[in-house]
Amino acid sequence: MVEPISKSTKRETIQGIVRGIRQDIDGYKQLKSLLKRQRELMQSRDNQGLHHHNEHQSRLCHNLMIKAGERRRMLKSLGFEATAGGMRSLIERLPEPVSEQVSMLWDNLISLVKESKQMNESNGKLLVGQQEVINQLLQRDEQPSVDYGDKR
């Protein structure tokens, strides 16, 4: 049987969730900047710079995933589903001035996540396009070429 958590523990947990959302907003702003830089490195074909950049970007993404997991755990500890819907339910149950502020923060975070996903998908398409060009060039070099009846 699960014991109910105290009022002060609930308050601390909610404060932890809000603090985490604020930190994630900063993290996703940083991720958007990194995704923009990643695209620039890909376009300039800076493989060494891209390698170092991607290590940094991967660490940030890993940290964001850990923080999302912590938020899910905190939501569950408060009796809410560990989903965006659970977060909305929590926000609706907060007192009015607080719920409005947390709702704005949450909406901002969701927007940044969506923008980051779109940028990442765009970078993925650029990478696929670059790989296709490289493959076409490699395949062309493997096939014997004939110009005016003479092999090159």
Question: Each PLM stretch: what is its role?
Answer:
Residues 2-4, 86-152:
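Short terminal interaction segments
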Residues 2-89:
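Extended, charge-rich alpha-helical scaffolding segments
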